[in-house]
Structures are given as structure tokens and as C-alpha cells.
Amino acid sequence: MEPALGSERRSPPGPGVPRPPPRGHAPSTAAPAPSPAPMSSSVQSDEERQPRISESGQFSDGLEDRGLLESSTRLKPHEAQNYRKKALWVSWLSIIVTLALAVAAFTVSVMRYSASAFGFAFDAILDVLSSAIVLWRYSNAAAVHSANREYIACVILGVIFLLSSICIVVKAIHDLSTRLLPEVDDFLFSVSILSGILCSVLAVLKFMLGKVLTSRALITDGFNSLVGGVMGFSILLSAEVFKHNAAVWYLDGSIGVLIGLTIFAYGVKLLIDMVPRVRQTRHYEMFE
């Protein structure tokens, strides 16, 4: 009977009976380890946000590398064609208006010895040419988002800007050196008012369309119209100042020099920006 008792003493306790802790030690209550999931999720979210930010910064560059403008992602096909037609209508209107103003301004320049009128006439001719380039730019309905076609138009505009600015500055400097005095009459007043108002309205329309179509050519054409509006008002300003104070005879020529230098600087900036892009996108002919 005793061996049986010994065997009962050696039998281990059941799993449901806990063992007492050793003396001198407090019972350990192990707290569950914090889950690393929130930290890892926050790290992942930061890592996901980082490439998104960099991708958004390089988004337009990626489109240009594929031969497309940013308007290809902003506008639906029917919206792009609608704005393209509006750009064509505005360009035709600009050609008609500025051509008439150019003839009138050249007449004023010859009859009244006005450097500003000559400068405006040259700028009006430039506006006619730039609007014709915009017509070519949007003549192809399938190329409304073509980056290469856009940049070629801008390069041509840059060259025209340089040539016209040289002519304006040379004419203005010649008038300043020979001390040509402008004459004031109702014809000069009418031309300056009409050119200032009409060119300013055309500039606003071109800026709005250029922003929607993300077209640097349209924005450049709008800048040229804005310069034409400023020159139209400058004719009125210089004529009125000379009428009340003949000592300020140089104001007309000085404005002509300033406007010529402004056009020259814009043309140089345009060529610096656009010539490399023409080379980058010349192999792409991706149209809608």
C-alpha cells in the first residue's frame, strides 16, 4: 500500500493548480507588450505621403516628357475643343482689330513724329503675327494638348519679340537724339484711346484662355496685347504732358525705349525657357 502512496506523492499537480511563487519574490504580473501596429502604420503613411508630394511636384514635368500639356488632365475632350474654338475666335478678332490700329498708329507716327505711336504700331504688327501663330497653334484639333507644338509657337514668338523690340528702341533713341517734338490733335487722341481700351480687353481674354488651356503661347499673346494697351495710353499721356509742358518733350521717346526693353527682356526669357523644351519634346507626337 505504501508504494501506491509514494506514487501519489510523486505525481505532478494538474494544470489547473497554480504553483506558489518562491519566497522573497513578488508575484510578477507581466503587462502585455504594446502593439507596434500604430507606429508602423504612421511610418507607412508618412512614407506614402512623401512620394505623393514629390510626384505632384514633378507631375507637370512628367506630362511634358510625354509630349502633353497640363490641360490634358484638367479638361475633358469636349471642353478642350470648346476652349480651342474660343482661342481661334479671339485670335481672329485680335488680328482684325490690331491690324486696323497698326495702320492708324503708323499714320500718327509719320504725321506727328511720335515715337510712342511708332512703337505701338510695331507692337500692333507684332500682335498680328503672334495671333497668327496662335491660330497655327490651335488649327489642328487633335493637337490641342501638344507640348511640342506649343513650345515651337513660343520660340517663334520669342524671335519676333526680339526683332520688334530692337526696331522700337532704335526708333525711340533716334527721336530722342534729334529732339523730335510730338504734335497733339484729335486724331492722336482717338487712336490712343481706342488702342488702349481694345488691346486691354483682348489681353484679358487671352490671359483667361491661356490659363484654362495652360498655353504659354496664348499668355504671351496676351502680354503683347497688354503692352499694346499700355502703349496706347502712353501716347495719350505723353501728348497731354507735352501740351501742358513743352519742356518734357523727351517723355514720348523715353516711354518707347522702356517698352522696347521690356519686350526684349520678355523675348529673351521666352527663348531661354522654351528652346530646351522643344528639344525635349520633339520626338513626341501624342495627340488626342
UniProtKB/Swiss-Prot annotation:
Catalytic activity: Zn(2+)(in) = Zn(2+)(out)
Statement: the UniProt record of this protein carries the keyword Cell membrane: yes
Highest taxon, organism lineage: Eukaryota
UniProt feature, compositional bias: Pro residues: 12-24
UniProt GO BP: myelination; zinc export across plasma membrane; zinc ion import into synaptic vesicle
Record topology, Cytoplasmic segments: 1-87, 137-149, 208-216, 276-288
Keywords: Cell membrane, Cytoplasmic vesicle, Endosome, Lysosome, Membrane, Phosphoprotein, Synapse, Transmembrane, Transmembrane helix, Transport, Zinc
Region (Disordered): 1-64
Gene Ontology terms: cellular component: early endosome membrane; intracellular vesicle; late endosome membrane; lysosomal membrane; plasma membrane; synaptic vesicle membrane
Free-text tissue specificity from the UniProt record: Widely expressed, with high expression in the brain, cerebellum, heart, lung and spleen. In the brain, mainly expressed in the glutaminergic neuron subpopulations.
InterPro entries: Cation_efflux_TMD_sf (IPR027469), Tmem163 (IPR026765)
Bilayer disposition of the protein: Multi-pass membrane protein
GO-annotated molecular function: zinc ion binding
Keyword Transcription: no
Subunit structure: Homodimer. Interacts with MCOLN1. Interacts with SLC30A1, SLC30A2, SLC30A3 and SLC30A4.
Similarity comment text for this entry: Belongs to the TMEM163 family.
Role, per record: Zinc ion transporter that mediates zinc efflux and plays a crucial role in intracellular zinc homeostasis. Binds the divalent cations Zn(2+), Ni(2+), and to a minor extent Cu(2+). Is a functional modulator of P2X purinoceptors, including P2RX1, P2RX3, P2RX4 and P2RX7. Plays a role in central nervous system development and is required for myelination, and survival and proliferation of oligodendrocytes.
Name by which UniProt lists this protein: Transmembrane protein 163
Organism of origin: Mus musculus
Name of the gene encoding the protein in the UniProt record: Tmem163
